[in-house]
């Protein structure tokens, strides 16, 4: 059966010539998809001929295949009745190839998983997950679409936004001033939150996660879901941060519960209740590859269709692929995160460190040029949000109580700065005009600045 289908693809290409359908098949199918050596060789020659000479000629293909295959190639062409179902047969060949790859991988990994030591078996299972996610699925046909056809879809989008009002199809962070600048996150966005250590990256990310998970998907009555890959903090620490944030308490208070009064315990209970009601999931793992992150996210999206945001804390802790240079590895990770957002139709937020060079400047407010390791992060990101707190450098500054959330890139909107008070390690809304005046006017002398203030939260 498999041989007949593969023969039908080769025969259809040979008798049909270089039609648009044939071009689609040549663009989406790989020679390795053919299990029969004869057809694999014939497909390689056909594709080479189509690319180099812009034609498919049966006699020329047979000749280039050599004496071993020439006669069989011509017989394949003669025995094919029609090229009418070429695309359907090609899809069957691609599906069969993917199944063979999966079965071969399972056979290869069965022994080390079944009979290896506990550690070796665990490593083998990790390798199985990674390689399964790397098996390329058969590519769907890619073709141009006329703008006139897309306009109908966009009309539906506008109508949905009109009906839903503030609850549009962009994802809101829960920080009103930030949403006013960015317009919210689109379904395919990669958002980077970057800062030097101690500025509050993780705290801001968790605040956004809570803001997203507190909202309902328009028209469904179902709350939005969030998936957090926490590679720096344990799941317990994430919960602790969440409870502290909900109760507007310092994390240090929760670490000394014997000192809490009744009001403190009431805040803890309220925070626990709030977090328990949110559909927020945490993957607690110190090292994950970007392929593993994608595999887990795909499975979670299938099981929980309300998943609305994926968060990775942080980009520098994602396991790097083998590459000649570190910037190439980072480029692979950022590009893969962007592709995941696009394919899953779910925005991805990734935290990132900034270069130490920012510390060498008199004005330490970060820019996109300070992104560590690779300019590809700036290229792949749809939005970049930088954090700056004057208190990290000068606790006595008049601007010390405030945090600046700086939108330095916004592919679909404007740039700007949002101000929040930073109280007990948490971001709190404040009067924007007042904060702007104080932070703009503040210009502490370089000699008075400290590199890092004591006790800053990460």
Swiss-Prot record:
Gene3D superfamilies: DNAb Helicase, Chain A, P-loop containing nucleotide triphosphate hydrolases. GO terms for molecular function: ATP binding; ATP hydrolysis activity; DNA binding; DNA helicase activity. Its EC number is 5.6.2.3. Residues 355-375 are annotated as: Disordered. It comes from the Viruses. Residues 164-436 form the SF4 helicase domain. Keywords: ATP-binding, DNA replication, DNA-binding, Early protein, Helicase, Hydrolase, Isomerase, Nucleotide-binding. GO terms for biological process: DNA replication. ATP binds at residues 195-202. It catalyses: Couples ATP hydrolysis with the unwinding of duplex DNA at the replication fork by translocating in the 5'-3' direction. This creates two antiparallel DNA single strands (ssDNA). The leading ssDNA polymer is the template for DNA polymerase III holoenzyme which synthesizes a continuous strand; ATP + H2O = ADP + phosphate + H(+). Coiled coil: none annotated. It is an enzyme of class 5 (isomerase). InterPro entries: DNA_heli_DnaB-like_N_sf, DNA_helicase_DnaB-like_C, DNA_helicase_DnaB-like_N, DNA_helicase_N/primase_C, P-loop_NTPase. Pfam families: DnaB (PF00772), DnaB_C (PF03796). Renders P22 DNA replication independent of a functional dnaB gene of the host. Belongs to the helicase family. DnaB subfamily. Homohexamer. This is Replicative DNA helicase. It comes from Salmonella phage P22 (Bacteriophage P22). The gene is 12.
